């Protein structure tokens, strides 16, 4: 598959939504974090799981513990949590989420920041954990066509 320039990004953006299921200690905590703090609409649920609309993608919090090990890799002088998941947002949506999380008192693993400023692939990023320890990275690019820039 050819993946170069703006055409590749348009192709990527036509992908279907992803689905991710992950463990949480408590569904009420997950509802507060993903629903109230992050603003994700709730979908179907049961006593053991709850769906959230994660920027057009389906994530499902399942009872069954926490995220387990808290491994990390050094990146740009920060300890980046591994594994982690997230979404590439528009810059205005990223800033709105950063403001929302900051106002709600979120504890960031890596504070909202700009990486590669003035370079190809310039991006805004932030890392944080949900109450069960699942790590999330939310990012946005100054130029979406630079998603895979080297």
Regions found by a protein language model. Name each.
Residues 30-35, 101, 133:
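Conserved active-site tyrosine of GNAT-family acetyltransferases
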């Amino acid at each position: 598959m050819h993946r170069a320039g703006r055409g590749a990004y348009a192709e990527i953006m036509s992908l279907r939504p992803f689905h991710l299921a992950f463990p949480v200690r408590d569904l009420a905590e997950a509802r507060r974090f993903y629903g109230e703090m992050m603003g994700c609409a709730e979908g179907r649920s049961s006593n053991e799981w709850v769906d959230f609309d994660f920027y057009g993608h389906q994530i499902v919090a399942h009872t069954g513990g926490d995220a387990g090990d808290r491994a990390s890799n050094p990146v740009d002088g920060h300890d980046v949590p591994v594994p982690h998941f997230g979404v590439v947002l528009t810059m205005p949506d990223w800033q709105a989420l950063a403001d929302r999380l900051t106002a709600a008192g979120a504890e960031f693993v890596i504070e909202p920041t700009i990486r590669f400023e003035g370079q190809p692939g310039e991006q805004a990023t932030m890392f944080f954990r949900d109450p069960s320890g699942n790590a999330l990275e939310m990012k946005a690019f100054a130029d979406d066509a630079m998603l895979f820039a080297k």
